């Protein structure tokens, strides 16, 4: 077991490769990434056996920026017989089970990469899931409760109709979503599709059990670059009063809520009203990532907000390096002022050439 598979948005394979190589080296694990442009996944092969399992346990998945899923995989199963794909797949799982106890497994995902070519296999994968699940259950696997906080999900990752990897991810260190993609429904009354970015960010960064405590009707938010109101919509939906900062017009439906004040100002110059305690800052402005980082840092250092979610638009080249530089600069700014904070970043499904960052100041 010396291989990891990591899913990603097509076109971001090199960023995933750089990130997993860095994260592995921090743990003293070395290997190389197999990258195929626009494939939607990366294979990281460790030089030593069993180290992939260690990485799947010890690299905090929620600290990976560009990966949608992380799992330990077998060697590629090739030339599967269309008349019986199940037998060699079960045999490959049996080989993996020599090192990992699949009695604690609870779910099976038969998946493809998130590309147009791979999606042509989606109907097959859906139909194949039922007989494969039955075969794996006969082995005594997939019987654990889905709500448990330990154990594994089993994965069968098809790259071609008769070629797949089999593997597993750890329940306490993976994405629980099929293909690593949350399925969100666009609200009919939302002003723009960008609303899904902030909804996914909230679901990603804030535990469900804490959401009502951290986003509620007793709080005030600021949305920089708010027009037409996709991000403001998510805050208003959760009860916040929002200062929507943008020279452009806001959706009439948001004005009708009575929960926003439209401030026709430059987002870089706006300051929160005096004697108003702002809890949340959100920002989705099209600007250089270094400039947005400085703006967010200013708000946090001045005590103008306690928690923030914002987007960093990525350059055409050296995207991973730019992200790390921006995050490190922000961390240094806050640490120099002795602020305690938690920072996370993710290339969300609803992001494109951008990442979403969450920072929360702690007491």
UniProtKB/Swiss-Prot annotation:
UniProt-annotated location(s): Cytoplasm
Gene Ontology terms describing biological process: methylation; rRNA processing
Pfam families referenced in this protein's UniProt entry, alphabetically: FtsJ, RlmM_FDX, RLMM_N
Organism superkingdom: Bacteria
Catalytic activity: cytidine(2498) in 23S rRNA + S-adenosyl-L-methionine = 2'-O-methylcytidine(2498) in 23S rRNA + S-adenosyl-L-homocysteine + H(+)
InterPro entries per record: RlmM_FDX (IPR040739), RlmM_THUMP-like (IPR048646), RNA_MeTrfase_FtsJ_dom (IPR002877), rRNA_MeTrfase_M (IPR011224), SAM-dependent_MTases_sf (IPR029063)
MF (Gene Ontology): S-adenosylmethionine-dependent methyltransferase activity
Main localisation: cytoplasm
Keywords of this entry: Cytoplasm, Methyltransferase, rRNA processing, S-adenosyl-L-methionine, Transferase
Enzyme nomenclature, EC number: 2.1.1.186
Quaternary structure, from the entry: Monomer.
Similarity section: Belongs to the class I-like SAM-binding methyltransferase superfamily. RNA methyltransferase RlmE family. RlmM subfamily.
Function: Catalyzes the 2'-O-methylation at nucleotide C2498 in 23S rRNA.
Matching NCBIfam families: PRK11760.1 (NF008734)
The protein's name: Ribosomal RNA large subunit methyltransferase M
Native species: Haemophilus influenzae (strain 86-028NP)
